[in-house]
């Protein structure tokens, strides 16, 4: 029987600054009444932007306007553009089975075509998931193992001009996802892609803010992000 919950479409456009090197993918934004700004990680009690403040400015409140309990969207957009940080989510249509923001009760109706997203930022070499649901969707899309929290695996990517298709079901809490349209990867050959699984920035995730920042700091440490790891061939099927 179909779920009675309404289908929600993603409220934001992908944020893909020119020259982006890191793509952050969450699951899906919370309901609008939880936002303090119309941008990614908009919930005032989500710590993503505090983590970025700690890592880059040694100040958890760098992107915060505490008196107004909101984040500084203009400052965040400028920072992400300068640093080459891209954002979207692994689902573009969902149902909230319990009417809340919990990943555990989020039914993925339509997954994001991640290869198509990557084709728009050809210099991106690092993909980061920020929660369990997002990690499951990416592992299913690329047919790869799930990395441990705070670690990454390298995915061998098809060469320039390869035609790819993606899509699969993502476990018992997700509906079957129809394969996406085939996508051509333009630009320079993307030999491999670092796939990082990071701890959730939600306060519900049982890890101290400082420990989360320690994990996320690895993304911005060249010796860590460029270390040699076994390369796992992507199972995206070529149709050309």
Where on the chain are the PLM-derived regions?
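Structural motif
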Residues: 21-22, 126
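Short hydrophobic-aromatic micro-motifs
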Residues: 23-25, 85-89, 196
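C-terminal capping/extension of enzyme domains
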Residues: 1-14, 18, 30, 42-44, ...
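Internal catalytic-core helix/loop-beta-alpha segment
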Residues: 82-141
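Catalytic nucleophile-elbow at a beta strand-turn-alpha helix junction centered on a G-D-S/GDSL motif
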Residues: 22-33
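Short, conserved, surface-exposed binding loops centered on an aromatic residue
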Residues: 15, 77-80, 119-120
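Short, surface-exposed acidic-centric catalytic microdomains
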Residues: 33-106
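Short, well-ordered beta-to-alpha junction loops that form the rim of enzyme active sites
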Residues: 27-28, 129-134, 200
